[in-house]
């Protein structure tokens, strides 16, 4: 049955994509119709009555009537939904509550209804249609894929509503669909232990040499999967040969029973993998699955920094962005592989763009999708079936073009994530550009990095904290640091203006001990952040963010005469 369902799914995805493309010729009309439908459906909710949605007839009235509010204004309402009260934000029953990771701020609850979920599912289907066509154009095939996200919910609210990460809700509510796509049983996503879950997902996927894709939320998580594949290659091969699941893998007894029932030995495949391991010295995705056609993960933001390490593991395998989304919304859909620009998802929400000169305004003037300009940066407001109106999650996007009349956008950074020794406002996008260029210039891929400020409250130094990959060394650290300084001046004009006059003192390089960023990630897990949502800021004004990590060396520039802090 599954053999013909996957091609059928691809056909359906292709039709959804074609329909979406037709609508991108009429972006304003599609957006206006979405808003009208939502206002009519939501006018009798508690918030709908408060805002008198039934009286709103135009987009201008909507902007005038509805304020731009942070999550804190919705929190009392989502707490009542958590307790089970109906018709607060949505007229439809809430079937799930997305709990945001809290990796870039406090945690939030986002109500999910079937209507909302269906709109997001449609965006995913459209992205699948784009991917299938992009692969076909490159003589590659779409097919089964590996995903290691947890499918474990966090719990059930007093009102009887399941809650957890957004990805868990997507997987649970779309279980039948995803079972057609996975190269491993759905039950492999159930182990609580992160390593155990990755192990069994890899184990079952390795049985399928013709697997076509690998998916993870962020590039860093794909690299972690590659690390597990390399580290546990011998044990995985042994389990494939013998038809066992190693007792050292920490599985709940019920999950182990379910997986062992579906597992059997494959000595031929084990022999093939052993030969690859012996000839190449390691297992990588590209060697284990020679038919690999794509990897799908987040693009934009800090992704380019991690992409520098992809060729070692994936060769020239195309990288697909799928959809640009958060727990609150799906913002855009990627039309092709190896591209950062994604098409505004005009059927999943009503979107407004806040120009830079309005970012500090209490009631910002906004633009519609067709009014934005290429090369400009905007904050993105969304109104959708979650019951949030003109909601600003803080993402800053750049418009890089248009697809018919719909803008192509790229996520650049989250507003508020800025670094300032004075008033220069260095963003995560600035430093990611710089660190990516440094990796290329010095031929030195890094484990990770984070730019912080020194302890001084007056004229603090930029601290360039890096961790080298095992076996790597930085032979000319002062040149590396000087190049960082020069490249950051090029990336951020405000930094460039303040550096020569020493308003911003010279940066300093700190080489952290091996395993430092693994320690940071473990700290996040201990804070309750799901392992599939792991990400951390690459800039931080929190002087304690890297507290407790060992610094192997600190390097200063020659003009830096101040004592090290």
Put a short name on every predicted segment.
Residues 131-177:
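Active-site cavity-forming subdomains of large catalytic enzyme subunits
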Residues 1-54, 62, 66, 77-80, ...:
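Active-site glycine/GP-rich loop and adjacent strand/helix microenvironment
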Residues 117, 121-128, 428, 432, ...:
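Amphipathic alpha-helical segments in well-structured domains
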Residues 33-37, 41-97, 109, 115, ...:
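Active-site diphosphate/adenylate-binding microenvironment
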């Amino acid at each position: 049955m599954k053999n013909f369902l996957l091609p059928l799914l691809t056909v359906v995805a292709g039709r959804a994509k074609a329909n979406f493309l037709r609508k991108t010729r009429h972006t304003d009309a599609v957006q206006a119709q979405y808003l009208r439908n939502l206002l009519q459906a939501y006018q009798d909710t508690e918030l709908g009555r408060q805002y008198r949605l039934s009286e709103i007839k135009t987009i201008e009235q909507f902007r005038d009537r509805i304020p731009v509010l942070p999550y804190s204004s919705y929190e009392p309402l989502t707490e009542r939904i958590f307790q089970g009260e109906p018709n607060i934000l949505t007229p439809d029953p809430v079937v799930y509550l997305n709990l945001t990771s809290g990796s870039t701020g406090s945690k939030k609850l986002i109500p999910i209804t079937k209507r909302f979920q269906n709109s997001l599912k449609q965006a995913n289907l459209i992205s699948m249609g784009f991917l299938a066509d992009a692969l076909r154009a490159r003589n590659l095939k779409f097919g089964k894929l590996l995903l290691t996200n947890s499918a474990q919910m966090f719990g059930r609210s007093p009102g009887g509503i399941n809650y957890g990460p957004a990805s868990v809700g997507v997987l649970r509510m779309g279980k039948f669909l995803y079972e057609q796509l996975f190269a491993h049983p759905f039950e492999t996503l159930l182990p609580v232990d992160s390593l155990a879950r990755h192990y069994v997902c890899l184990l079952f996927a390795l049985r399928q040499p013709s697997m076509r894709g690998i998916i993870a939320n962020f590039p860093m998580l794909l690299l972690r999967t590659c690390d597990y594949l390399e580290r546990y290659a011998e044990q995985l091969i042994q389990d494939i040969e013998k038809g066992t699941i190693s007792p050292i893998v920490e599985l709940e007894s019920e999950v182990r029973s379910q997986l062992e029932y579906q597992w059997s030995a494959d000595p031929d495949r084990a022999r093939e993998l052993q030969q690859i391991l012996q000839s190449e010295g390691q297992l990588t995705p590209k060697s284990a699955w020679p038919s690999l056609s794509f990897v799908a993960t987040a693009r934009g933001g800090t992704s380019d920094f991690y992409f520098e390490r992809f060729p070692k593991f994936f060769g020239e395998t195309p990288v697909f962005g799928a959809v640009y989304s958060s727990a609150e919304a799906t913002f855009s859909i990627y039309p092709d592989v190896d591209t950062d620009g994604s098409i505004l998802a005009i059927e999943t929400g009503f979107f407004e763009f806040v120009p830079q000169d309005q970012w500090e305004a209490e009631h910002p003037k906004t633009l519609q999708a067709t009014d934005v300009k290429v090369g400009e940066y905007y904050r993105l407001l969304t109104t959708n079936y979650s019951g949030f109106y003109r909601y600003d999650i803080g993402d800053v996007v750049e418009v890089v073009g248009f697809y018919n009349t719909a803008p192509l956008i790229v996520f650049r950074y989250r507003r508020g994530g800025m670094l300032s020794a004075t008033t220069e406002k260095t963003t995560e996008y600035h430093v990611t550009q710089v660190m990516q260029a440094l990796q290329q210039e010095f031929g030195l891929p890094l484990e990770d990095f984070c730019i912080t400020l020194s302890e001084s409250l007056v004229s603090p130094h930029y601290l360039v904290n890096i961790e080298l990959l095992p076996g790597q060394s930085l032979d000319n650290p002062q040149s590396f640091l000087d190049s960082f300084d020069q490249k950051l001046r090029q990336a951020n004009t405000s930094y460039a203006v303040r550096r020569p006059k020493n308003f911003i003192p010279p940066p300093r390089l700190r080489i952290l001990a091996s395993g430092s960023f693994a320690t940071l990630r473990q700290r996040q897990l201990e804070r309750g952040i799901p392992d599939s949502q792991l990400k951390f800021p690459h800039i931080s004004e929190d002087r304690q963010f890297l507290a407790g990590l060992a610094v192997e060396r600190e390097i200063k520039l020659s003009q830096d005469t101040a004592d090290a802090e």
